[in-house]
Amino acid sequence: MAKEKFERSKPHVNIGTIGHVDHGKTTLTAAITKQFGDFQDYASIDSAPEERARGITISTAHVEYETENRHYAHVDCPGHADYVKNMITGAAQMDGAILVVNAADGPMPQTREHILLGRQVGIPYMVVYMNKVDQVDDEELLELVEMEIRELLSSYEYPGDDIPVIPGSALAALEGRDDAIGKDSIDKLMAAVDEYIPTPARAVDQPFLMPIEDVFSISGRGTVVTGRVERGVINVGDEISIVGIRDTTKTTCTGVEMFRKLLDRGEAGDNIGALLRGVDREGVERGQVLCKPGSVDPHTKFEAEAYILTKEEGGRHTPFFANYRPQFYFRTTDVTGTVNLPAGTEMVMPGDNLKFEVELIAPIAMEDGLRFAIREGGRTVGAGVVAKIIE
């Protein structure tokens, strides 16, 4: 099955397995690689190495495989805390997820939590694998569990009635027995993933955005801002907006430079300098973004989903309370903000993950799904994602 050479001709999609502990996420991951990739056994996936993302230690296993139609990068995490951190930091961005539910147990607390997190952090699509069906003798019971899963998904605003639910046994597939619930179920699952989870728009095809990292003035030519283009394309002559921190202004890009060479355009992934017409050195600063006019607005108030580091991870040693005022680091800059805790929450302990409201002292170019770090005096004490913009 293994391909000699990685062909970049197929569209690429990032997915992962989510769900309650011991429901079979890692076994399923192994079974998929057995049929569609270079086989990785359970042990090698389960002993995932630790990585650091935004100062947070996360264990994540990365595997890749391909179907007729697509190439997939797939993440699987050994522990529940790793999932929470992964989803919140966006360390492994997912275009869709395979929710694994044990048919004998039905949805459990972490099943719920992962669906809620998926909704908050913007995982747009889910496909369900109902695992361990050989442990349930009663056909009606399977139907009830499926209904329960669909209702749970609907309650978190996923289209529960439309989401594919594939019954099977990942272990049977891995051990090469009972093809009807084993191997065939994995084929059905990947066919559903192929069809139901759309290929995301490539970064280049999205509206232009570049966080400003530095500002220079070049005598006789004007002001140059530098940064890495996050998405889209900028052409010489394009009208662009400068958004965040101050009032939004418009300007025209009169030149694009990369490695000291003049180009006609810069695109997603490029580190460029953009020459701005009629903007003086004081008129623009790090922390603002250049973007396609009207594509992103500045905001100060939002609902966040956040993970607070433990003291072992270098975070706080003590809890924080209402009106906590740390810095929120968005893209390239820190902005002070006040935390408004949800009703009934008195304090937040290191190691907690929760939802709260934030009000910043200056507006930031913001959209749902934007990641940030929570810092105190330059030290990271948490990570979060904009779940919903309020104003």
UniProtKB/Swiss-Prot annotation:
<dbReference type="InterPro" id="IPR031157">
    <property type="entry name" value="G_TR_CS"/>
</dbReference>
<dbReference type="Pfam" id="PF03144">
    <property type="entry name" value="GTP_EFTU_D2"/>
</dbReference>
<dbReference type="GO" id="GO:0003746">
    <property type="term" value="F:translation elongation factor activity"/>
</dbReference>
<dbReference type="InterPro" id="IPR004541">
    <property type="entry name" value="Transl_elong_EFTu/EF1A_bac/org"/>
</dbReference>
<keyword id="KW-0648">Protein biosynthesis</keyword>
<dbReference type="Pfam" id="PF00009">
    <property type="entry name" value="GTP_EFTU"/>
</dbReference>
<dbReference type="GO" id="GO:0005737">
    <property type="term" value="C:cytoplasm"/>
</dbReference>
<comment type="function">
    <text>GTP hydrolase that promotes the GTP-dependent binding of aminoacyl-tRNA to the A-site of ribosomes during protein biosynthesis.</text>
</comment>
<keyword id="KW-0479">Metal-binding</keyword>
<dbReference type="InterPro" id="IPR027417">
    <property type="entry name" value="P-loop_NTPase"/>
</dbReference>
<dbReference type="GO" id="GO:0005525">
    <property type="term" value="F:GTP binding"/>
</dbReference>
<comment type="subunit">
    <text>Monomer.</text>
</comment>
<feature type="binding site">
    <location>
        <position position="26"/>
    </location>
    <ligand>
        <name>Mg(2+)</name>
    </ligand>
</feature>
<feature type="region of interest" description="G4">
    <location>
        <begin position="131"/>
        <end position="134"/>
    </location>
</feature>
<dbReference type="InterPro" id="IPR005225">
    <property type="entry name" value="Small_GTP-bd"/>
</dbReference>
<feature type="binding site">
    <location>
        <begin position="19"/>
        <end position="26"/>
    </location>
    <ligand>
        <name>GTP</name>
    </ligand>
</feature>
<dbReference type="InterPro" id="IPR004160">
    <property type="entry name" value="Transl_elong_EFTu/EF1A_C"/>
</dbReference>
<feature type="region of interest" description="G5">
    <location>
        <begin position="169"/>
        <end position="171"/>
    </location>
</feature>
<keyword id="KW-0460">Magnesium</keyword>
<keyword id="KW-0963">Cytoplasm</keyword>
<keyword id="KW-0342">GTP-binding</keyword>
<dbReference type="InterPro" id="IPR000795">
    <property type="entry name" value="T_Tr_GTP-bd_dom"/>
</dbReference>
<dbReference type="InterPro" id="IPR033720">
    <property type="entry name" value="EFTU_2"/>
</dbReference>
<feature type="region of interest" description="G2">
    <location>
        <begin position="55"/>
        <end position="59"/>
    </location>
</feature>
<feature type="binding site">
    <location>
        <begin position="131"/>
        <end position="134"/>
    </location>
    <ligand>
        <name>GTP</name>
    </ligand>
</feature>
<feature type="binding site">
    <location>
        <begin position="76"/>
        <end position="80"/>
    </location>
    <ligand>
        <name>GTP</name>
    </ligand>
</feature>
<dbReference type="Pfam" id="PF03143">
    <property type="entry name" value="GTP_EFTU_D3"/>
</dbReference>
<dbReference type="InterPro" id="IPR041709">
    <property type="entry name" value="EF-Tu_GTP-bd"/>
</dbReference>
<feature type="region of interest" description="G1">
    <location>
        <begin position="19"/>
        <end position="26"/>
    </location>
</feature>
<dbReference type="InterPro" id="IPR009001">
    <property type="entry name" value="Transl_elong_EF1A/Init_IF2_C"/>
</dbReference>
<dbReference type="GO" id="GO:0097216">
    <property type="term" value="F:guanosine tetraphosphate binding"/>
</dbReference>
<dbReference type="GO" id="GO:0003924">
    <property type="term" value="F:GTPase activity"/>
</dbReference>
<feature type="domain" description="tr-type G">
    <location>
        <begin position="10"/>
        <end position="201"/>
    </location>
</feature>
<feature type="region of interest" description="G3">
    <location>
        <begin position="76"/>
        <end position="79"/>
    </location>
</feature>
<protein>
    <recommendedName>
        <fullName>Elongation factor Tu</fullName>
        <ecNumber>3.6.5.3</ecNumber>
    </recommendedName>
</protein>
<keyword id="KW-0251">Elongation factor</keyword>
<keyword id="KW-0547">Nucleotide-binding</keyword>
<dbReference type="InterPro" id="IPR004161">
    <property type="entry name" value="EFTu-like_2"/>
</dbReference>
<dbReference type="InterPro" id="IPR050055">
    <property type="entry name" value="EF-Tu_GTPase"/>
</dbReference>
<comment type="similarity">
    <text>Belongs to the TRAFAC class translation factor GTPase superfamily. Classic translation factor GTPase family. EF-Tu/EF-1A subfamily.</text>
</comment>
<dbReference type="InterPro" id="IPR009000">
    <property type="entry name" value="Transl_B-barrel_sf"/>
</dbReference>
<keyword id="KW-0378">Hydrolase</keyword>
